[in-house]
């Protein structure tokens, strides 16, 4: 997607090593490293003059929609309904002020405060986009919900997600995005795999690749047919639950502005002897195809 630095004003006294170009570059790097969910869903770029972007939700066609044709005869047309899903663009802003005195105190040889502003801004905007996307996972917002509030996660719940997605013809790759406690907590996926270390006739997970990966790296990248991800933006709620989700890429989508997802401008405030770094993210998110997602809410403590 396009990343634009907007209209920037950089004076000799306001600039940092490398100028605003370096600040934007650092922000882009931080954004791409920190973002988890956005690469897993659909994305579109809006057009100039429009504040909304539409995604098409196509009805899933079944084998029963395909007829056995007779030679040289017309087949009856099948009605395949579509629904427009709208993402409304809005601004998300973070401002970082760096005073001249603070900048001088930390130096401008690559370790200055201004030189690091881009990374701070990129991380914050990335986290906000993830937070907005995982809000779409909320229990009750989707037709299908495995496990459920107040219920501890079990392997059967993960496979139930797989069953539902396959029954609704959700295309691969399939993603499983969990909160940190859903992954590593006492009632999380890690505990389920670790608890299977002594295999029985019905419990062999601890001695397969998932158990080996967990022991060696502390993480599982593949489990039960899913690519596994975690994000701190899935937070424990007041009922001690976290709301993860199993989904195909077409389940959710987000749109960015015509100039890109992120811009950075600098503005000099001479009377205060500081430089303002303003990062703006422009996006809107929406559920696209409800049947290609399963909310996976579970008790974590």
For each predicted feature, which ranges?
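Glycine-rich, charged/polar anion/phosphate-binding loops
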Residues: 38-40, 159-164, 213-215, 260-264, ...
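C-terminal appended segment following the main domain
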Residues: 250-301
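Extended, solvent-exposed, turn-rich assembly/linker loops in the middle of proteins
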Residues: 138-219
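Signature of extracytoplasmic/envelope-associated structural regions
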Residues: 2-15, 19-20, 27, 64-66, ...
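Short helix/loop capping segments that flank catalytic or ligand/cofactor-binding pockets
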Residues: 63-66, 97, 106, 185-189, ...
